[in-house]
Each structure stands twice: as C-alpha cells, then as structure tokens.
C-alpha cells in the first residue's frame, strides 16, 4: 500500500502520504505530510435515491470530486442492498468495509481484477460494490455486468459529460449515474435516457 501513496489503519482510517518517492525502489525515502481520512458511521441521507437505484435495476456509478461523499454513498447503498440481495464488497483500499457492511461478503486488499473474478465465480452475488474505478478497471466491471451481476462503483469526476469524455463507450454497462458535489446536491442521471432527477440533500 505504501508504495501506492497510502496505508490503512486497523479501524479503516486511510492515511495518504506525501514525500520523496524513489521510483526505482517503489518506496518513499522521506515523508513530508500525512492526510488522515477517518471513517465515520454516516448514512446517505436520502433513502428514496437508494430505493430508486435498486428498483430500477442495472448498474450504478457514483461520480464526484474528492470528499464529495462517494464512499459514504457506496457504503449506504451496500447496506441497503444487503438487506435485500446477496452483495460482495470489493474493498481494495480497506475503506468500504470499515462500517455497516456486516451482511456483505467482503474481499479486502485484492485488486479489482481478482476481486471481481472471485466474486462472480465463487460467491454468487447479485451486486458487487467497489470504490474508485479507473480506466484500467472498467473491462473487469463490464465483464461482471455481462455475467449478469450488477455493479455499483465510484469514479472521480464532475458530471455525466466529464466521465463520457474520459471513458467513452466503456461506461455503456452502467444504467444510472449519481452525480455528487461538495455543495451536497445529488443528481441521478439515467444514462440510457439522459434524464436527470436533482435532489439537494446534505451528505
């Protein structure tokens, strides 16, 4: 983890690291600052949004800049889903499973390729939840969806147009996008119909 710029404490606190990185060895030679992201027992405020995402069917992507509430939304959605269906949480960075995922099957510390493969082949979920998907991860996400398993994940971004520009057709496997921002507004966008529902709620 440290070579990736962070490490995770036993309670789920993620500590980001800044300093002098030595590329050849893949380690930090010295540290200049640390950023602590302490997990809290928070819930996504509008259960009706979670209910809509579940009842409408299809995979969901939560989109927002850092600290916009993406991980909180995913945790709440995982908890909501786990009361209704079988859920696997692919927790690569040890953050998603810090709180309120007791009824989920959790794969911690594995990269998304391995976690998605194990989930589909061995755990029989209806949903897989993961955080911070990159362009390189999307083929594994789409393979999972094409296998008949819905996915809820997050990406860094600011709008539907932003993620479409950056990721193109790779996002075709998602049905809805939930756009979050630091002003605590929530937009649910139907990616198949381009319709938008806006809700202003504090996260």
Model feature map: region roles:
Residues 62:
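Hydrophobic anchor at the beta1->P-loop junction of P-loop NTPases
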Residues 10, 20-29, 180-203:
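Conserved P-loop NTPase
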Residues 1-57:
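P-loop NTP-binding catalytic core
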Residues 125, 130-191:
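Conserved P-loop NTPase nucleotide-binding/switch module
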Residues 69-70:
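Conserved glycine(s) of the Walker
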């Amino acid at each position: 983890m440290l070579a990736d710029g962070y490490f995770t404490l036993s309670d789920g606190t993620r500590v980001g690291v800044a300093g002098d990185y030595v590329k050849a060895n893949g380690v930090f030679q010295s540290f200049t600052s640390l950023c602590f992201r302490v997990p809290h027992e928070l819930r996504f405020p509008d259960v009706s949004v979670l209910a809509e995402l579940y009842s409408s069917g299809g995979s969901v992507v939560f989109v927002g800049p850092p600290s916009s509430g993406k991980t909180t939304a995913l945790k709440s959605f995982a908890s909501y889903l786990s009361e209704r269906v079988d859920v696997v949480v692919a927790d690569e960075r040890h953050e998603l499973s810090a709180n309120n995922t007791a009824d989920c099957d959790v794969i911690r510390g594995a990269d998304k390729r391995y976690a998605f493969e194990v989930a589909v082949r061995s755990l029989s979920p209806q949903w897989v939840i993961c955080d911070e998907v990159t362009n390189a991860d999307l083929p594994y996400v789409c393979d999972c969806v094409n296998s008949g398993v819905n996915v809820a994940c997050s990406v860094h971004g600011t709008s539907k147009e932003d993620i479409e520009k950056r990721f193109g057709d790779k996002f075709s496997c998602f049905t809805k996008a939930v756009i979050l921002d630091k002003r605590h507004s929530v937009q649910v966008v139907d990616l198949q119909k381009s319709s938008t529902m806006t809700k202003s709620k504090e996260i």
